[in-house]
Amino acid sequence: MFKGIRKRASNLSIYAVTSNLSATNAPSDQQPASNSPSSYESILSQVHDFEIALKAMDYLLDDRTQQGTELLHEQAQLGSSDGKPHAIFPLALGVMEFIEATLGFEPEVMARAHKTLNDAESASTTNAKYNVRHQLATSNIYPPGTEFQVTLAESTLLNALLMLLTENNGMVESVKALYKLRKAYQTLDAVYKKIKELEPVFNRNLAKLRKAANKGLLEVPRLNGLVNGGTRLKHSISTVDLPGYESLGSSSSSSSATLPEDLKLMKNLEKIYLMRKARIEGTNLGNNTGVQHQPLNLFSDLASSIAMKQNGNGVETSLPIIPQYGKFNNGNEEQVEEQEEEGEGEEEEEENSDNEHFVDAVEELTIGDINSSSLADSSAQSILSSVETSPSEVQSTDMHLHVSTTDEFIHSGVQLCFGILQVVLSLIPPAIGKVLSIVGFKGERETGLKLLWKTAITSRNVHGELALLFLLMFYDGPVQFVDTGFRLPSANKLKNIINLENKTSVTDDEVELIKDSPESYTSQLLKRARHHFPHNALWILQEGRMLAAEGRLAQASTLMQNFTDNPNNKIQMQQIEALLIFDRATIYIYMHEYDKAARDLIYLIEINSWSKAVYLFMAAACYLERYRMVRMGLQSPQINADTKLSLNGDVELEAKKYSDLFTKYLNLSLSYVPGHGANAQKKGGLGGSGKQMPFDKFLLRKWKHIEQRKKRHPELSLADVVGTSLIHELIYFWNGYNRMSPQDFELALKLLGYSGAPNTELSANTLHNNYAKIEETEDEAMIRYFLQSVALRQLGKVKQGLGILDSHVISKYVISEVPQFRFHKMTYSPYLYPTAFYEKTMFVWLLRTSESTIKQDVGRAVHECKSYLKKAETVGEGDYELSNRTSMRIKAAGDRLDQLGSLSR
C-alpha cells in the first residue's frame, strides 16, 4: 500500500503516557503490539465502531444519508450504556454534514456541521487518552491512541475549513480557524512521518501473515475430541484486528473452559472481517449483490497458494485457502459441501446484521453444550464458515483484507487529509503563502497529489472516494486549479495506460506516470465509484464534468439530462441536485443552447440559496445572447435544420420576447445582491450572508456600465445598451474556453462580433448592416478582442490570435516592456489586464514548442513564458473582483512551467 515512500526517522508523541510501541527505537524485527485478554472485548468493540462508521459514510456516498445517519444514531444509543467513548461516530456524522454543508453552503447546515465536528474533536481527545491509559492497542504497529489522533486531526481540519468558508465570520473566528488548521497540520505531519518510518514494519507484518497462512495445516489441540479427534485446521484465522491475540493452536495447555471465550472472540472477529470484506467488495450497502461468487483465495498471487489435503483414500487434493476461518471436517467431502452451503447462508445473515451487538459466547454456548454430536449445529459453524467473493475481486482483496481496519483508517485518513492540506496550501498566492510558511504551514503540491492518488487508488473507504472527488475537482472542476494547456508535443502521443482495476498498491514511479495523464485514470476510478454507489447523482455530476473537460459536451449534457428526467432517479441531497443542474446549465451555455441553460438557472433559485443573484444574472445573460442570435439569424450547432426558427415575420416578435426576459431577470438579479437596492436585506451571497461575493461585484459593475449607457440612450431597451457579450465573459471564468468544440468557437466568434464597431477587425457590423445600436467603446472593445483572441487560438489560429491580443488589448495599457516594464493602471475591467498576460503565455508556449518549429528549446520557452506571468502578477496586484480566480490561474501556470522547466534541464 505504501510502496516507494521514503523512510525517514521521526517521532510521534501521543500524550505523555508511555505506549507499548517505542517510536524512536523500534527494532527491525518488531513484533505486533500485545494486549491483555481482558482488553480484547474493548478493542474489538472499537474496531466494530470504525466499520460501522465507514459503512454509514458509504451510505452518504450512495445518496442515502438518512440511512447512514440512522445507523450512527442507533449504534451511539446502543453504546451509550457501556461507559466507553465512541469517538468515531461524531466524526462520521461530522464528515457527512461537512460534505452536505460544502456542497450547498446553506448557513443552517454549516452551523450544524460545525457543532458536530466540535463534538468529534472532544470525543477524539477523550478516546485517545482512554486508549493510552488502558494500553488498548488496536493497531499492530502504531502506539495506542494513534487512530484517534487521526480522527482528531480529521475533525479539526474539516472544522477549520468550514469556519474559513463561513464568510460572515469575524476576525476572531478566522484566527480560530487558522489555529485549528495549524493544529491539524502538525498532527498529520507527525503521523505521516510515523507511517513512513514504520512502513518496513507494516510490510514485514503483512508478509509474515501471508507466509504463516501459507505454511500448511495447523494442529488445534484445544478442540481435540470434538470432531473425530485431532482435527487438523488450516491456519486461516487472522487476528489482524486483535494485536497480540494467541490463535487457537498456540496454547495446547489451555483448558476447554476458555473455549466459550475463544468462540466469542472468533465470532466477533468474523463479524468485523465480513463487514470489511463486504465494504471492500462494494456489497455492504446491498448494491452489486447479484454477482456469481466463488471461494476466495487471498494468496492466489503466491506460487504456493494452494493448500494440500489428503482425502480418505490418501490422495492429495487442493483446497482453496480460506481467508480467516477454517472449517471442521473429517476428510468427508460431502460433509464439507454441506458445511459450505450452510456457511453461505450464515455469511449473508452476518452481512445483513452487522449493526447488532457483539456475541456473548458465555450466554450462547455453555461448557455443557460442547460435544461432538452437537458441535455441527452450534455457532461454531458460522464462525468457521467459508468466505466467498466474486472472481473479479480475488486479486484486489488480498492485501486489503489482511490490513486491519484500524491500520487502514490511519493510512487512508492521513494520506487524504495531509494530501488535501498540501495541495490547498500550494494553491495559495505566493505573498500569503510566505506568511503562512513562517508560522508552520508549507504546501507541497506534488507530495499532496501523490498522497491523494495513492489513497484514491488503494483505499476502498470514504477516504478513497473523497480523494477521488478532490482529484476530479482539481483536474476537471469549473475552477482552473491546474493548467494542462502547457504540454510538450510528445505528451500527446499515446502511452501505455496502467490498469487500476484490483490494484492494491501503487509505486511512486507509477504515480508520476498517472499524473502525466490524469484523465486516463480518473475515468477508471470514477467507473469503480459508480459501480459501488449507483444511486448517487454526485458520480453522474463528476462523469458529466469529465466528459465536458474532454470536449464531449453533448454527451455530458445528455447524461445529466437523462438522469434527472428519469422518474426512477431520486436525488436525496438537494445540494448535489443543485450542483448537477448548475453544471448542466454551464454546459448548455458552452453549446450556445441558452434557453435550456436559462431554464436550469432559474430553477436553481427554488432549491439552492448559494447566490440567487448570480443564477438570475447568468439567466439574464443567456436571454441577451438569444436576443442577439435571433437578430443575427444564428442558431446553436446542436439544433437540427428542420427545427430552426422560421425567420420570416417573427424575428422582431421573437427578439422582443428575449429582450423582455433579459430586462426581467437582470432587474430581479439585482434585488438579490446583498447591500444593493430596495431589497438589500434579502438572502444572498455565500451561505446567505450579507457579504457580497466576487460575482456579485462583477454583476454590480456590469449594471453600472449598462445604467450609464441607458441614461445616454433612454429610447433603447436594456438589451440594446449592453456592450460585449455578458455570457461569454462568464463562460471564460467558468473554464468554458477549455471545453467548447470548434463549431462552438466559430459561433462564439460571430456572436462576440455583434457589439463590434463597424468595419473593425472581427466585427459582425458594417456601415450598411449594423446590429449594434450603441457605439463600441475602447474598454468594451478590449474585452471583445481578448475573448476573440482566445477563441482563435482554440481554433488553431495561434498567430492571428496573438496578433489580436497584442494590438487590441495589451498595447492599450502597456507603455513599455523594455528596459523597464511600465503600464497604465486601468479600472474599467480589473480582471482583464493581468488575464491578458496570462493568456499570452499560452500563445507564446504554443508557438515556441510546436512540432513545426525547426528547433524546440523548452528552457527558453519556459523562461519567456514566466516573464509574461511575472508581468501578469505585477499588473494584477491589489484586491479586485475575481482577483482570487485570476491569481489562481497565474499560479497554476507558473507551477506547471516550473515543472516543465525542471524536466528540460
Curated annotation (Swiss-Prot):
Recorded protein name is Inclusion body clearance protein IML2
Highest taxon of source? Eukaryota
Q: Which UniProt keywords apply?
A: Cytoplasm, Nucleus, Phosphoprotein
Tell me, what does this protein do in biology? Inclusion body (IB) resident protein that interacts strongly with lipid droplet (LD) proteins. Involved in LD-mediated IB clearing after protein folding stress, probably by enabling access to the IBs of an LD-stored soluble sterol derivative that acts as a chaperone in inclusion clearing.
Give the similarity note.
Answer: Belongs to the IML2 family.
> Compositional bias (Acidic residues) spans?
334-353
What segment(s) does the record annotate as region Disordered?
325-356
